[in-house]
Amino acid sequence: MTLQSPLTFRDEQINIGELKQELEKFSSYQKEEFLQHHPVTNLVLSRAEYMDLLLNRLWQHFGFKDIHNISLVAVGGYGRGELHPLSDIDILILSNNKLPNALEAKISEFITLLWDLRLEVGHAVRTVDECAEIGRADLTVATNLQEARLLCGSEDTFQALKKVVLSDSFWPSETFYRAKIQEQRERHARYHDTTYNLEPDIKSTPGGLRDIHTLSWVARRHFGATSLLEMSRYGFLTDAEYRELVECQDILWRVRFALHIELRRYDNRLTFAHQAQVAEHLGYVGEGNRGVEMMMKEFYRTLRRVAELNKMLLKLFDQAIINGGASEDAEIIDEDFQRRGALIEARKPALFQARPETILDMFLHIANDSSIEGVSPPTLRQLRTARRRLNKFLHTIPEAREKFMALCRHPNALHKAFSLMHKLGVLAAYLPQWSQIVGQMQFDLFHVYTVDEHSIRLLKHINTFSYAENHSKHPICCEVYPRIQKKELLILAAIFHDIGKGRGGDHSVIGEGEAYDFCIEHGLSKPEAKLVSWLVRHHLLMSVTAQRRDIYDPDVITEFAKQVRDEEYLEYLVCLTVADICATNPELWNSWKRTLLAELFYSTQRALRRGLENPVDVRERIRHNQQMASAQLRKEGFSAREIEVLWQRFKADYFLRHTHKQIAWHCENLLRMEDTSKPLVLISKKATRGGTEVFVYSPDQPALFATVVAELDRRNFNVHDAQIMTSKDGYVLDTFMVLDQHGKAIEEGRHSAVTKHITHVLEDGRPTKIKTRRTPNKLQHFNVKTKVDFLPTKSKKRTLMEFVALDTPGLLAKVGRTFADLGINLHAAKITTIGERAEDLFILTSEAGGRLSEEQQTELREKLIEKLSDSVSA
């Protein structure tokens, strides 16, 4: 492609149509060059150079070249000579004195032409004095002016501006530094102070391009350094740090350039909508979401490196330059370390290189001394150097292994040491498997954090079980955790539970073997290694069983108890499970999940104490529930005969699957009904089992489950569990466990309206129309293949169906309608939403009351996939 230099544009070419054509040709050329993997630095700089030439030519065309004491100045990122495809082109039209009206009108025409060309131009028209006044009052303006670069016009006017900007009175170096530090803190806070955001902003997120800019702004203000290279020449950063920053900037620039050629409007957010295409542009390919995950892994690792360098260099700048090298007196800890203020520092300049195991000593001191808040900047620099020069992982050093296990056994390590070890790259330097999960993301809405960040948060959540104030939120764990004798085993299981992710295959199986080998290598006994590896292998077992299996079925409890083996394993597992859920996504943990896990924990505990050879006597449980419910009903004034007549209508399963309190609540209201042929809808006034219980009694009718679910969906409620039963005389006795959109029980003020609407649709007898809503934008970029599997079960009468699909609006109602269309009876439903995925379990029987035949299973699978495909495409 032949490109014409803007300087050679003839006057007749300077019109909107032809200029747009030339700009489009240039952008297409740059896109082609980028996709052919030309260096992004060249493209970013050449784009700014092209814009320089274009603005010069237009400046000349409008006759500004002949006007004295006026300058066209590039500021901000454009002033640095850097432009991405959608970057703002910030310019300043500078003069010595206020411009006459005629000239202002001409400048307005100039700016309008730039806008008509769809260039993202930000402009200001100011005198030198105005720049000085506004710049002193506004940090952003001062920063932009600091990067000012003359494009064309009066050199004298521009130099007058530079003289003002470079003067100490404009922004003293220390004042500027403090202001920039505060600005960065506020920016980081907007992104939750983490480099790990699911849809990160390439420019502004912690560790992003702005963190590099902040370093350069501070150095430019103090030294006058105009580039990263000059910063290294002034000693602000070492040659190795300079090379690392350049490398990181190049990676971030490539991602940003790829994003910009994909977008129509300026944005720096790497959203789900564009991650796959950006990954493809950058050459990351793989099955499914593998390409995206590979790209994001490198991206997150880059953010970590920039954030670490930014923090260290700014602290060094503060200590060595702003404070003139003055520091507090050192307090000696031992021969290797001392404490200076709240920071620990090495006493020897090459300590970590000479004896790498002393790195772990430093973290033991941090765990021991609550007054130590961090590591001194020079020691951070030494640690980074030593880390790069390690020729083997730290775990291969016997002394390091002893110190690592001492940390695992230290009561304060969870609170302070491990998160800092991760942040400073020590866990990755210790354990090769950990280095593989750093920055490992999962392309979904469920896992809010990368694998490494999630694992660190899991450790922090385990630590919260030590504090009594968390008992109401985590009653079982706060009761169990203090009596766990070897907490280091739980810590190791937490470190290894997801360590196999990103390598293909079952991450639990991969982690199981690696955890066992690690434990043996670190001197643990075989039974201890076996416990840790079992926890890693089965870390999802309790969560899956509680949320996706029928935990009111004695066979399910017995099978789970067999896998758990004994109470010790159960106590370790419940702590790991709860911490894992809480560390996956802050919005996941709610009272409903707490109740499910508590019921599973205590049912399993009873089964283990009773002995697995002594299973639950179903008849005894039914008898117990009936006796307790009857006693409660008789207290309310009902006779034994009234109760008996009502209960003769119910099947035994009703008394097995409800507590005596539920039975009494249902029956009290049924016995008070004047006409028991009409529907009855009850809503629990208090949250029960962590949610709102909706009980429906009604003559059976086609698609009743779908009707009730559709009505609840219309009110934006989510069904998480359903028990579907019929009486001997054809009445339904259905119980729905319902939460609102925020995972909480339904507000009492809405109960009467919900009761009224469900009663109305049941009396009407016609299936409720499923409310059609657009699939939320955040779900549109995920592809969840609909899967229908039929699980093995001991039951000869019932079929277990596991169902996975994209969690689109009205999904459960559509599934229920399909069951009704095929004459399939639903007995129970367990509804689990995992990010964008619905993972549900249904217990079904055929119209004849038995298990579904293979033909019926095939037909059901085909109909569900067909119906959901139609709704998604619609």
Swiss-Prot record:
<dbReference type="GO" id="GO:0008773">
    <property type="term" value="F:[protein-PII] uridylyltransferase activity"/>
</dbReference>
<dbReference type="InterPro" id="IPR003607">
    <property type="entry name" value="HD/PDEase_dom"/>
</dbReference>
<protein>
    <recommendedName>
        <fullName>Bifunctional uridylyltransferase/uridylyl-removing enzyme</fullName>
        <ecNumber>2.7.7.59</ecNumber>
        <ecNumber>3.1.4.-</ecNumber>
    </recommendedName>
</protein>
<dbReference type="Pfam" id="PF01966">
    <property type="entry name" value="HD"/>
</dbReference>
<dbReference type="Pfam" id="PF08335">
    <property type="entry name" value="GlnD_UR_UTase"/>
</dbReference>
<dbReference type="Pfam" id="PF01842">
    <property type="entry name" value="ACT"/>
</dbReference>
<keyword id="KW-0511">Multifunctional enzyme</keyword>
<dbReference type="InterPro" id="IPR010043">
    <property type="entry name" value="UTase/UR"/>
</dbReference>
<dbReference type="Pfam" id="PF01909">
    <property type="entry name" value="NTP_transf_2"/>
</dbReference>
<keyword id="KW-0808">Transferase</keyword>
<feature type="domain" description="ACT 2">
    <location>
        <begin position="800"/>
        <end position="874"/>
    </location>
</feature>
<dbReference type="InterPro" id="IPR013546">
    <property type="entry name" value="PII_UdlTrfase/GS_AdlTrfase"/>
</dbReference>
<keyword id="KW-0460">Magnesium</keyword>
<comment type="function">
    <text>Modifies, by uridylylation and deuridylylation, the PII regulatory proteins (GlnB and homologs), in response to the nitrogen status of the cell that GlnD senses through the glutamine level. Under low glutamine levels, catalyzes the conversion of the PII proteins and UTP to PII-UMP and PPi, while under higher glutamine levels, GlnD hydrolyzes PII-UMP to PII and UMP (deuridylylation). Thus, controls uridylylation state and activity of the PII proteins, and plays an important role in the regulation of nitrogen assimilation and metabolism.</text>
</comment>
<keyword id="KW-0548">Nucleotidyltransferase</keyword>
<dbReference type="InterPro" id="IPR045865">
    <property type="entry name" value="ACT-like_dom_sf"/>
</dbReference>
<dbReference type="GO" id="GO:0006808">
    <property type="term" value="P:regulation of nitrogen utilization"/>
</dbReference>
<dbReference type="InterPro" id="IPR002934">
    <property type="entry name" value="Polymerase_NTP_transf_dom"/>
</dbReference>
<feature type="domain" description="HD">
    <location>
        <begin position="451"/>
        <end position="573"/>
    </location>
</feature>
<dbReference type="InterPro" id="IPR006674">
    <property type="entry name" value="HD_domain"/>
</dbReference>
<feature type="region of interest" description="Uridylyl-removing">
    <location>
        <begin position="333"/>
        <end position="692"/>
    </location>
</feature>
<dbReference type="GO" id="GO:0008081">
    <property type="term" value="F:phosphoric diester hydrolase activity"/>
</dbReference>
<keyword id="KW-0378">Hydrolase</keyword>
<dbReference type="InterPro" id="IPR043519">
    <property type="entry name" value="NT_sf"/>
</dbReference>
<comment type="similarity">
    <text>Belongs to the GlnD family.</text>
</comment>
<feature type="domain" description="ACT 1">
    <location>
        <begin position="693"/>
        <end position="777"/>
    </location>
</feature>
<dbReference type="InterPro" id="IPR002912">
    <property type="entry name" value="ACT_dom"/>
</dbReference>
<keyword id="KW-0677">Repeat</keyword>
<feature type="region of interest" description="Uridylyltransferase">
    <location>
        <begin position="1"/>
        <end position="332"/>
    </location>
</feature>
